[in-house]
A protein has these predicted regions:
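Glycan-processing catalytic domains of CAZymes
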Residues: 1-155
Length: 155
């Protein structure tokens, strides 16, 4: 038992905490996941909502210093690496790739990571309070062998 390795702790990393063009078009200028966080309502006694972010506040992931601080906090908490959600909708169409592209290009933060492919169609009902509205925002497509190769080469 003394030579057993510790398990890797990987934190999922949602890259939607910054404005981007498509969210502005679909939900209004300046919409980010922070908009949804701020709308949270308590559902039962003792359920404190909305949760106000602690250490880094309402951060913007476009700022390299924020990503560095996140990596430092993760290390302090015993996290081994991040799993960045990766949005490849087929035929070369991506969303939210700027953050991971910058991490790869700069090597910062210097923190282990992997990608998790969030391969699903985005529909408006995912964000509508009542779950209504099947409006497709962006469709997940599987474009065949050339597209698969292109995606593989990207990652």
């Amino acid at each position: 038992m003394e030579n057993q390795e510790k398990p890797l702790v990987i934190a999922y990393y949602l890259p939607q905490f910054h404005p981007f063009k498509e969210n502005d078009e679909w939900w209004g200028k300046g919409f980010t996941e922070w908009t949804n966080v701020g709308k949270a309502k308590p559902l039962f006694r003792g359920h404190y909502q909305p949760k106000v972010p602690a250490d880094l506040g309402y951060y913007d992931l476009r700022l390299p210093e924020i990503r560095q601080q996140q990596a430092e906090l993760a290390k302090e908490a015993g996290v081994s690496g991040f799993c960045y959600w990766h949005y490849w909708f087929g035929e070369g169409r991506q969303l939210l790739n700027e953050i991971i592209d910058e991490v790869v290009a700069t090597g910062k933060p210097d923190f282990p990571f992997c990608l998790g492919w969030a391969n699903e169609t985005w529909k408006a009902k995912q964000w509508n309070k009542d779950g209504s509205g099947d409006k497709v925002l962006i469709e997940q497509r599987y474009g065949g062998e050339d597209d698969y190769r292109h995606h593989f080469e990207y990652v």
